[in-house]
């Protein structure tokens, strides 16, 4: 279940912005040292067929609104995800994401 809000966190006010502003996220830090990012991805179009994101640590990406297709490095085909679903990407890897609508997500940094 998606948490609608987080309490007792510190928010990094400086956003991470990529793809000319089409993707942005903010990092939140919990008192116990855990980190998560909350982000928004705008739809792909004729200028951006898909987005590619690299991972340094294992990540579980939870889709909180919208729908998208994801192809994790090493996989042959894209898989479909929608709000309420998540996927895991190992550390030192990456994934492609394509979408026709705005996607919001929580990235749980697990490594």
Curated annotation (Swiss-Prot):
Q: Keyword Transferase on this protein?
A: yes
Record's keyword terms, sorted: Glycosyltransferase, Transferase
Extract the GO molecular function terms from the UniProt entry: guanosine phosphorylase activity; purine-nucleoside phosphorylase activity; thymidine phosphorylase activity; uridine phosphorylase activity
Q: Which top EC class applies here?
A: transferase
Query: Which cysteines in this chain are paired by disulphide bridges?
Result: none
Reaction(s) this enzyme catalyzes, per UniProt: a purine D-ribonucleoside + phosphate = a purine nucleobase + alpha-D-ribose 1-phosphate; adenosine + phosphate = alpha-D-ribose 1-phosphate + adenine; cytidine + phosphate = cytosine + alpha-D-ribose 1-phosphate; guanosine + phosphate = alpha-D-ribose 1-phosphate + guanine
Q: EC number(s) of the enzyme? A: 2.4.2.1, 2.4.2.2
Keyword tRNA processing among record annotations = no
Q: Where are the transmembrane segments?
A: none
One GO location term (cellular component) = cytosol
What does this gene product do? Catalyzes the phosphorolysis of diverse nucleosides, yielding D-ribose 1-phosphate and the respective free bases. Can use uridine, adenosine, guanosine, cytidine, thymidine, inosine and xanthosine as substrates. Also catalyzes the reverse reactions.
Task: Read off the HAMAP family from this record.
Answer: Nucleos_phosphorylase_PpnP
Please give the name of this protein: Pyrimidine/purine nucleoside phosphorylase 1
UniProt gene name: ppnP1
């Amino acid at each position: 279940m998606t948490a609608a809000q987080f309490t007792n966190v510190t928010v990094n006010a400086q956003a991470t912005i990529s793809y000319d502003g089409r993707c942005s996220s903010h990092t939140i830090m919990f008192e116990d040292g855990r980190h998560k990012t909350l982000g928004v991805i705008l739809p792909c179009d004729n200028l951006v067929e898909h987005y590619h994101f690299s991972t340094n640590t294992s990540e579980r990406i939870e889709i909180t609104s919208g729908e998208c297709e994801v192809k994790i490095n090493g996989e042959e085909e894209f898989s479909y995800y929608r709000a309420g679903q998540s996927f895991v990407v190992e550390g030192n890897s990456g994934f492609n994401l394509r979408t026709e609508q705005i996607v919001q997500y929580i990235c749980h940094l697990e490594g």
